């Protein structure tokens, strides 16, 4: 990890690499019909192909046997470029957590994490290759931004994990945009992916909007824009401290949108969506874990969001080269109690995948 005393710059809009060829999942319903028409195929084939992709979780048209044999190769070449190739999959938590490293068409790397629980299966997906938000305690942020992912690259992470769960006799039930990247910095493609994830087959995978979480470091205008999409996904705001002075360092976007503006936007989202906002808070020993910060956090959240908020405390996950580590257990417990005392619910999140660098803030997509 880059030395936190030498901050890297924010990067919102200057990815260094090229986007992949257009994929079926990148196209609207009308665009799919037009693309098939150019191949000499009738429009009903678009629905047929969608049922294979979203319903049967097939990404190779050669397996779509209800398509004419002569059409399968055409469809594959025109609409199903290979977006991702698995490089490596590593497991933790007795096989219940699996981190997959993917190589994209241009050599860019990304990671996704599948977490199996007794009553659900959650996929943590990436929205960008790398991240431009430059948070000094996060391995992804310190690695910088390669490029935005296409809608197809985001959606295909979900299809691949859904196929894995289906092969095991299970079902992928939850999606969290908490992998690599700032989702709201790739706004249009992320919203398109959310709609495909949550639409019923054959328009999408049929995962409930209430089981989808979109995280952000606090891009206030984009939070308000998301609220106006009339979605009911959970918004998770990575706050990490309630005071602007420290947050300017921990979350550099705070120099553009301060805590009050972020919380105002979060309240707007809660009011429009009817959903409780999740506040993510990485507890860092002797940095942001003081009792007075817990009091301030609880007071600010209660004032801004009332009952429409829950705090997830995340003991800082170790990253290579970082000078920081997690708060001790007794301080975690005190922090929880002091936030709750201000009328805000608060829990310490169960951390999965730490030993394989699959936990929050650890994804670095390294080919090692």
From Swiss-Prot:
Describe how the cofactor binds.
Answer: Binds 1 [4Fe-4S] cluster. The cluster is coordinated with 3 cysteines and an exchangeable S-adenosyl-L-methionine.
Reactions it catalyzes: adenosine(2503) in 23S rRNA + 2 reduced [2Fe-2S]-[ferredoxin] + 2 S-adenosyl-L-methionine = 2-methyladenosine(2503) in 23S rRNA + 5'-deoxyadenosine + L-methionine + 2 oxidized [2Fe-2S]-[ferredoxin] + S-adenosyl-L-homocysteine; adenosine(37) in tRNA + 2 reduced [2Fe-2S]-[ferredoxin] + 2 S-adenosyl-L-methionine = 2-methyladenosine(37) in tRNA + 5'-deoxyadenosine + L-methionine + 2 oxidized [2Fe-2S]-[ferredoxin] + S-adenosyl-L-homocysteine
One of the GO BP terms on file:
rRNA base methylation
Which positions are annotated as binding S-adenosyl-L-methionine? 181-182, 215, 238-240, 317
What family is this? Answer: Belongs to the radical SAM superfamily. RlmN family.
The UniProt entry, under PANTHER family, shows: 23S RRNA METHYLTRANSFERASE, RADICAL SAM CORE DOMAIN-CONTAINING PROTEIN
Protein name per the record:
Probable dual-specificity RNA methyltransferase RlmN
Q: Which organism is it from?
A: Corynebacterium diphtheriae (strain ATCC 700971 / NCTC 13129 / Biotype gravis)
For this protein's source organism, the top of the classification is: Bacteria, Bacillati, Actinomycetota, Actinomycetes, Mycobacteriales
Tell me the name of the encoding gene.
rlmN
């Amino acid at each position: 990890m880059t030395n936190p005393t030498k901050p890297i710059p924010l990067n919102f809009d200057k990815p260094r690499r090229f986007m992949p060829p257009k994929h079926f999942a990148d196209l609207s319903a009308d665009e799919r019909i037009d693309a098939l028409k150019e191949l000499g195929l009738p429009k009903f084939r678009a629905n047929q192909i969608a049922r294979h992709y979203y319903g049967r979780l097939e990404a190779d048209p050669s397996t779509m046997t209800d398509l004419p044999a002569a059409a399968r190769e055409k469809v594959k070449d025109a609409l199903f470029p290979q977006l991702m190739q698995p490089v490596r999959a590593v497991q933790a938590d007795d096989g219940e957590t699996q981190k997959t490293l993917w190589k994209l068409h241009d050599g860019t790397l990304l990671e996704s994490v599948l977490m199996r629980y007794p009553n659900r299966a959650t996929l943590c997906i990436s929205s960008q290759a790398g991240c431009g938000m430059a948070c000094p305690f996060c391995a992804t942020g310190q690695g910088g931004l390669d490029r935005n992912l296409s809608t197809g690259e985001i959606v295909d992470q979900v299809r691949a994990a859904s196929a894995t769960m289906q092969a095991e006799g299970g079902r992928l039930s939850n999606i969290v945009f908490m992998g690599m990247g700032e989702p709201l910095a790739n706004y249009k493609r992320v919203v398109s992916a959310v709609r495909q994830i949550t639409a019923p087959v054959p328009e999408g995978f049929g995962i409930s909007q209430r089981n989808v979480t979109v995280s952000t470091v606090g891009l206030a205008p984009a939070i308000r824009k998301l609220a106006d999409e009339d979605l009911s996904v959970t918004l998770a705001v990575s706050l990490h401290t309630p005071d602007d002075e420290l947050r300017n360092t921990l979350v550099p976007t705070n120099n553009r949108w301060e805590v009050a503006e972020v919380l105002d936007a979060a309240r707007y989202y809660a009011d429009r969506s009817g959903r409780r906002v999740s506040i993510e808070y990485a507890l860092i020993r002797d940095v942001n874990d003081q009792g007075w910060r817990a009091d301030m956090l609880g007071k600010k959240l209660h004032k801004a969001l009332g009952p429409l908020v829950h705090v997830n405390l995340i003991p800082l996950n170790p990253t290579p080269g970082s000078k920081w580590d997690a708060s001790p257990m007794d301080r975690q417990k005190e922090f929880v109690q002091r936030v709750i005392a201000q009328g805000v619910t608060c829990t310490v999140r169960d951390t999965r995948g730490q030993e394989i660098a699959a936990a929050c803030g650890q994804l670095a997509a390294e080919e090692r």
